[in-house]
């Protein structure tokens, strides 16, 4: 076990994760985080549009249920339940939900703005 682990939180209760509306129809909860990564859950209503944006964090996601059109750079794909994706840091990306979706994302390093809410 790493010595710095003593100062890091290692367990997170799901019912303690605060839900934040990012844009209409897009709700986020930060489920857990450590020194080098952050885990987030997104509940996306059909028609929700997360506009094109970028951030310096690498992002890996998994579609638990539903579907969405995901644009990463110049490539657009339909992602359905069971699909996953990788978005390199600083690459513009956008998501438009086709049907209600539950998506899990990991960010590295952790997004500071997601630690606040």
Residue ranges and their predicted role:
Residues 1-36, 116:
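A short, N-terminal "cap"/entry segment at the start of jelly-roll beta-barrel domains
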Residues 24, 40-54:
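Conserved short histidine dyad/triad with adjacent acidic residue
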Residues 43-45, 55-70:
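Short, conserved beta-strand element in jelly-roll/cupin
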Residues 64-65, 80-81, 99:
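A cytosolic small-molecule/anion-sensing beta-strand core signal
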Residues 67-69, 76, 92, 102:
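Structural motif
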Residues 74-89:
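Short acidic-glycine-tyrosine-enriched beta hairpin
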Residues 89-113:
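Ligand-binding loop in jelly-roll beta-barrel domains
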């Amino acid at each position: 076990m790493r010595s710095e682990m003593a100062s890091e939180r290692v367990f997170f209760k799901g019912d303690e994760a605060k839900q934040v509306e990012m844009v209409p129809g897009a709700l986020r909860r930060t489920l857990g985080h450590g020194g080098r990564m952050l885990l987030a859950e997104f509940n996306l209503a059909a028609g929700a549009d997360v506009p094109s944006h970028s951030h310096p964090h690498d992002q890996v996601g998994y579609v638990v249920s539903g579907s969405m059109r995901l644009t990463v750079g110049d490539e657009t794909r339909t992602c359905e339940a069971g699909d996953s994706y990788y978005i390199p840091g600083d690459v513009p990306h956008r998501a438009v939900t086709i049907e209600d979706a539950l998506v899990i994302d990991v960010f590295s390093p952790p997004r500071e703005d997601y630690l606040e809410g």
